[in-house]
């Protein structure tokens, strides 16, 4: 989870009309069937019979450690995959970078909007939130990491249908850990740092005042098309 996976955009025609013509959605991996989810996100370490029966005890002891990498997805992983995929697509559906409403949304600070309504209408967020609750150690983080690893973290765009789409990098996701001291300020600075690292730019100097820092982060999230 520490390495940032970057890919070049490969656009795929979408079946749903609300997703068509949107480079942010067309560049995402194709939706998997339930069987494909289970197959891709499972891992069963191969058993070497020679090591199992004839290797020295110390080697067999190390070999058993491979069981820690064993992954046998359950049905809740399928549901998590569907929820995350839907959240990504719905969020991007409202932010088609080729529409005038999105261009207005990107260029105005915070929730400001022009007096004249864009041709495609004012921007309306369709962002979703997902809550996963479970006992400590039940595998929530591992499950989410498995699902997120299916998606590239950065998609680089250069040409969409023969023209420059107006942006070059799309941050699909970032993982933020809550600070140990529960500081809102530290959390905000961590978000800003993660976005800088994902884009590949020098660390941005955080604003001193919390309100200004929040607006700084919001603007960075906008411009990077965070999923």
What are these regions (language model features)?
Residues 143, 147, 187:
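Hydrophobic positions on the alpha1 helix immediately C-terminal to the Walker A/P-loop
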Residues 150-162, 197-200:
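Post-Walker A helix-loop "phosphate-sensing" segment adjacent to the P-loop in P-loop NTPases
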Residues 140:
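Conserved lysine of the Walker
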Residues 1-125:
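A short, basic N-terminal segment
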Residues 155-179:
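Conserved catalytic segments around the Walker B and adjacent sensor/switch elements
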Residues 136:
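The conserved Walker
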Residues 81, 93-115, 121-125, 166-170, ...:
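Mid-core helix/loop region of P-loop NTP-binding domains shared across ATPases and GTPases
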Residues 132:
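Hydrophobic anchor at the beta1->P-loop junction of P-loop NTPases
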């Amino acid at each position: 989870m520490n390495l940032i996976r970057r890919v070049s955009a490969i656009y795929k025609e979408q079946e749903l009309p609300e997703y068509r013509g949107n480079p942010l959605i067309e560049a995402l991996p194709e939706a998997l069937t339930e069987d494909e989810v289970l197959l891709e996100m499972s891992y069963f370490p191969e058993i070497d019979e020679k090591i199992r029966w004839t290797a020295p005890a110390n080697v067999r002891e190390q070999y058993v450690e491979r069981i820690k990498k064993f992954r046998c997805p359950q049905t809740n992983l399928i549901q998590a995959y569907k929820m995350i995929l839907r959240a990504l697509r719905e969020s991007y559906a409202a932010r088609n970078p080729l529409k005038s409403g999105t261009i207005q949304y990107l260029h105005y600070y915070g929730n400001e909007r022009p007096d004249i309504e864009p041709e495609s209408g004012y921007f309306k967020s369709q962002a979703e939130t997902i809550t996963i609750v479970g006992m400590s150690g039940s595998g929530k983080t591992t499950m989410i990491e498995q699902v997120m690893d299916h998606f590239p973290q950065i998609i680089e765009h250069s040409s969409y249908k023969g023209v420059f789409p107006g942006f070059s990098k799309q941050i699909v996701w970032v993982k933020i850990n809550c600070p140990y001291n529960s500081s809102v300020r530290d959390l905000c600075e961590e978000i800003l740092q993660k976005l800088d690292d994902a884009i590949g730019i020098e660390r941005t100097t955080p604003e001193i005042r919390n309100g200004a820092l929040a607006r700084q982060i919001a603007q960075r999230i906008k411009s990077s098309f965070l999923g």
